[in-house]
């Protein structure tokens, strides 16, 4: 399976010109993101159903999350979006160093986010708040609070998985950038990955209030 | 007309006779050239082989079920075994045969050629989709071997999540994986059709097959991810008992049904829309007429795709859904009949005063029109809440969806395979055998499934391995029909394989058909589809058949 890639322009054999190739890539990424919206949409749908069925339980359960850590992570992710945007900008300007710095920054903030997530998960595990047979909520087993935590882990877990995939792709892109594969006129990978990374951030922007902030006004969180 | 391709592959075959033309089949040899190919035509062939394997597996399950149902007593299989048979039949046939059948085989092969380009937009992703399909299929076979699955293809909670003793989690993961192969195919088609049409190939010059593929692809990318997340939750529930579908913990099993049918009703249109596209091609060709109501057929595909997303609740009329929701879903479901009927009427209007000839593809197309109409109209019966209460979960439902899926999609797939066989492999299938097998399949199909309408109306429930004595006669009829149907399919497979070696060599345009794949591409096409260096420019509408112009409709022979 050879690439058929023309080394100087990056034009792949079955496209007429580089513009058509770029447009196809961008449309493909948008279509993929629409798929992602529906993928998360199923989870958001389940969340909407159960939150409207058990509003109090959801608030009680939500107050066991750490709003401070969630807030820090929100800021961290916004920063990662900024570095990603800077990387795309550098690619347009043709600055190889800028691309790599932006990607490294994105990687750095992504790693912080995941690190904080690990701390949070560990805390839930220690307090028996991971759904399953060991689940204990304020002394009681099971119940709708467990549904909240099931959704919490499913939604943040799927989100974290997307971040991990993103960071693997970043490693690969850094290698490509280092090799000088991206030119001002041809860096579709950087552009399209930027779209992906921003999408993953936006998902978090929805997750944060829906999961962390619904119990905040009860004042019982630590 | 021989072409020289400047591909690496060319060197491999340079030793061949100078007159021999390189085709996508001969461009390169060896298993690597197939397993690592990025040629959409080769990937179509890979898909064809793999879906046929699954078709035979799923068909075997069906025949075993029909064998059990020959007698009223459950004498051949235990109830549990029978449950596994119908579950695996459903899972294999739906996820591994019907959904990929036309899109991944005929669509993969034809979409780039029909729009006049060299390949799909993302050839490697195309190959990846086949590998994902294989992994999902392998996982399903693993489930089948290690104890099977007995939940029905619908995986309804809480049975699947709490009570079933079979390998539900692995099966859910298999379906999860397979979904991504379908998403990637849909993504590829959408981008290809949007961005890679040849100059002059405007949206309204596209063959209707492409409109159908496009609408199908929309459903694939919008619906499949919801199924993925649903079965993921099911696997989590099953493995960790998180309570999401467990009423004891506050979860709601009906939520599973909502999420599941949000995908799985539109999936029905993934399984029928591409078939409708094939029928449009065949009907126009064998009537030698322009398509009647081209725009209506094109937009009805999109309408079906859109309506399809708002009717899922008709599966829950008796699941405790509110009567008002039921009312709305019932009404919306009936609306789907409109675009479906638009297609049927336009096909019939195309036949009207056409120069109709009855080669094998046309026999299948006519069979499709009749059987799909029966399947569709009985679907309307089921959309009516009062009637649905009576026939819900009976053989009436089974007969209904087999008329649509087998009478519709499988007929269309068979018609399409016969229509484009010479294009794919350069040889003709034996025409008389083809016509004979088509009739056998049509007869066998009706004997198999028509009695099930009556059985269902009489009250025979689906998914039981034994039944009351008064249902025996019709069940025997149905089982007898199934053997005829199975024979017909086997005949077809045998003469198709035979024709690969001994079939008559086909000319470029076996049917004197219109369309780039016939007029511009050889049979079989070279690796990049068209003659080297030739830039396809489209100057006329689809289906520019000239029968009407040259002939005002009195009906005698006209020189093509
Ligand atoms: Cu439905």
Where do the PLM segments sit?
Chain A
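...captures the hydrophobic TM-helix bundle architecture rather than a specific catalytic motif
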Residues: 1-222
């Amino acid at each position: 399976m050879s690439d058929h890639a023309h080394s100087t322009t990056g034009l792949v054999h079955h496209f007429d010109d580089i513009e058509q190739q770029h447009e196809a890539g961008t449309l493909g990424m948008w279509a993929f993101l629409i798929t992602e919206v529906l993928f998360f949409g199923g989870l958001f749908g389940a969340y909407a159903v159960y939150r409207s069925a058990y509003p109090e339980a959801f608030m009680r359960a939500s107050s066991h999350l750490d709003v401070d850590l969630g807030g820090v992570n929100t800021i961290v992710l916004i920063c990662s979006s900024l570095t990603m945007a800077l990387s795309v900008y550098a690619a347009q300007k043709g600055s190889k160093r800028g691309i790599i710095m932006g990607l490294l920054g994105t990687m750095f903030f992504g790693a912080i986010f995941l690190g904080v997530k690990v701390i949070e998960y560990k805390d839930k595990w220690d307090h028996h708040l991971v759904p399953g047979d060991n689940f204990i909520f304020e002394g009681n087993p099971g119940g709708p609070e467990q549904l909240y935590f099931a959704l919490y882990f499913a939604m943040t877990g799927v989100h974290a998985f997307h971040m991990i995939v993103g960071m693997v792709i970043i490693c690969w892109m850094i290698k490509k950038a280092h090799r000088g594969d991206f030119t001002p006129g041809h860096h579709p990978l950087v552009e399209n990955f930027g779209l992906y990374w921003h999408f993953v951030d936006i998902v978090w922007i929805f997750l944060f209030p829906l999961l962390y902030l619904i119990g905040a006004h009860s004042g019982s969180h630590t | 007309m021989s072409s020289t391709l400047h591909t690496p592959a060319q060197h491999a075959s340079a030793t061949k006779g100078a007159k021999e033309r390189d085709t996508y089949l001969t461009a390169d040899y060896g298993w690597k050239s197939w397993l690592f190919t990025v040629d959409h035509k080769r990937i179509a062939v890979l898909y064809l082989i793999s879906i046929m394997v699954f078709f035979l597996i799923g068909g075997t399950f069906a025949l075993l079920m029909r064998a059990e149902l020959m007698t009223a007593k459950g004498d051949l299989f235990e109830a549990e075994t029978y449950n596994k048979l119908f579950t695996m039949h459903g899972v294999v046939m739906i996820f591994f045969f019907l959904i990929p059948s036309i899109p991944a085989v005929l669509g993969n092969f034809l979409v780039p050629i029909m729009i006049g380009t060299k390949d799909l937009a993302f050839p490697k992703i195309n190959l990846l989709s086949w590998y994902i399909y294989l992994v999902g299929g392998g996982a399903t076979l693993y489930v089948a071997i290690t104890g099977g699955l007995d939940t029905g293809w619908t995986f309804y909670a809480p049975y699947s999540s709490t009570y079933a003793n079979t390998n539900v989690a692995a099966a859910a993961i298999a379906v999860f994986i397979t979904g991504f192969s379908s998403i990637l195919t849909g993504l590829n088609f959408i981008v290809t059709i949007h961005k890679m049409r040849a100059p002059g190939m405007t949206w309204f010059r596209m063959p209707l097959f492409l409109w159908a593929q496009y609408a199908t692809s929309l459903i694939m990318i919008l619906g499949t991810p919801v199924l993925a997340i649903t079965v993921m939750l099911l696997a989590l529930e099953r493995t960790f008992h998180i309570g999401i579908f467990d009423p004891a913990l506050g979860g709601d099993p009906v939520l599973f049904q909502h999420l599941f049918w949000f995908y799985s009703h539109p999936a029905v249109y993934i399984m029928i829309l591409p078939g409708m596209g094939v029928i449009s091609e065949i009907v126009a060709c064998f009537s030698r007429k322009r398509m009647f109501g081209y725009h209506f057929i094109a937009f009805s595909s999109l309408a079906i795709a859109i309506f399809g997303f708002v009717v899922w609740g008709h599966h829950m009329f008796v699941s405790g859904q509110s009567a008002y929701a039921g009312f709305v879903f019932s009404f919306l479901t009936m609306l789907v009949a409109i675009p479906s009927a638009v297609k049927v009427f336009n096909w019939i209007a195309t036949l009207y005063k056409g120069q109709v000839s009855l080669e094998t593809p046309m026999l299948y197309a006519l069979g499709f029109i009749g059987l799909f109409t029966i399947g569709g109209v009985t679907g309307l019966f089921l959309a009516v809440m009062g009637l649905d209460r009576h026939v819900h979960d009976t053989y009436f439902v089974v007969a209904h969806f087999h008329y649509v899926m087998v009478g519709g999609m499988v007929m269309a797939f068979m018609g399409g395979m016969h229509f484009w066989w010479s294009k794919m492999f350069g040889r003709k299938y034996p025409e008389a055998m083809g016509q004979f097998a088509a009739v056998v399949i049509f007869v066998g199909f009706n004997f198999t499934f028509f009695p099930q309408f009556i059985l269902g109306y009489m009250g025979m429930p689906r998914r039981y391995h034994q039944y009351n004595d008064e249902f025996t006669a019709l069940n025997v009829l149905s089982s007898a029909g199934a053997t005829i149907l199975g024979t017909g399919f086997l005949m077809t497979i045998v003469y198709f394989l035979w024709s690969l070696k001994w079939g008559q060599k086909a000319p470029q345009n076996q049917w004197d058909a219109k369309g780039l794949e016939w007029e511009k591409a050889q049979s079989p096409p070279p690796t990049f589809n068209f003659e080297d260096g030739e830039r396809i420019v489209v100057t006329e509408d689809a289906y520019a058949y000239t029968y009407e112009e040259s002939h005002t409709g009195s009906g005698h022979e006209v020189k093509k």
